[in-house]
């Protein structure tokens, strides 16, 4: 049986080119299997050699057109993806965009996803008790007067807006009629409010035409009484031992401040919110995770390195940029590449005005002028030095 210090020294000696994370993982696994199978030094060396060989085989060849390979590897499975919006797996009440529309949404770096949602994990105190989890959900869930109303009526004769509140919904939201009235009175100074049991009557203080009443009624209905802005309904689900809250809508910055929420695990599917709150590295990881999860939902397997390349390019400048005419492609350093993409004359005029120089370092610009592209064997520049003829031969000539 080999000692742990010998294993460590063999890894350092034979696997010097391996990344630290791979070395550490290899060391831990060798220690584990050494205890189980009593490995010899020769066996340990063979295992390390195999790992090094596999690692080198996994590396990208110099000059490989990684962008083209990534585009093909993501594009081909995407043709088999569905074009529909599905219910989120396991949460039938919440609609979430999946499939190809979600992939397009991510790579286009849309500011607002079509179906934003958050997965809110809870802290030690709240995660094992359903009542406590629902209490946190009530703090998060955005509640408007419309959510609490059983019926709403516009009385044009008396110029009143009448709202019948549902007592069950009111109790579930954790509000009371007094609280509702107080919140509305503080927000709408131009209206009078009257309460009769579970009925709320709203009258404008001044009005000139019926449209004023309609406008006031719409504003009162949509007024948020509690919860986070941008968040609609919440659903509490049990996953394993703990309760998790799913939300329709997203307000990542505010949800992390809610008492009872675990800020280290809570997630949103809005990439821009993640970049704003947690930084660009977190946004990069979110892009990778979202695309990989969307692919897996459809039963498609794509090598994560292709997705990582896309995420790297999108977040290269410290902001999340789309892949397209308004982002990565439209901002290429090469004038000819930009001109070849679209709006040719405008790009050429602007570049001439600025005095730009094209170093012909990319593929498109070299294809345009008929040069070998700097990919694969085209990256290598050979110069051949011919042997000099001896002095005697020169004299004979």
From Swiss-Prot:
It is found in: Cytoplasm. GO terms for biological process: DNA-templated transcription. GO terms for cellular component: cytoplasm; DNA-directed RNA polymerase complex. It catalyses: RNA(n) + a ribonucleoside 5'-triphosphate = RNA(n+1) + diphosphate. It comes from the Archaea. CDD domains: RNAP_A. Keywords: Cytoplasm, DNA-binding, DNA-directed RNA polymerase, Nucleotidyltransferase, Transcription, Transferase. Gene3D superfamilies: 1.10.150.390. It holds the Pfam family RNA_pol_Rpb1_5. Its main location: cytoplasm. Its EC number is 2.7.7.6. One of its GO terms (molecular function) is DNA-directed RNA polymerase activity. The keyword rRNA-binding does not apply. DNA-dependent RNA polymerase (RNAP) catalyzes the transcription of DNA into RNA using the four ribonucleoside triphosphates as substrates. Forms part of the jaw domain. Part of the RNA polymerase complex. Belongs to the RNA polymerase beta' chain family. This is DNA-directed RNA polymerase subunit Rpo1C. It comes from Pyrococcus abyssi (strain GE5 / Orsay). The gene is rpo1C.
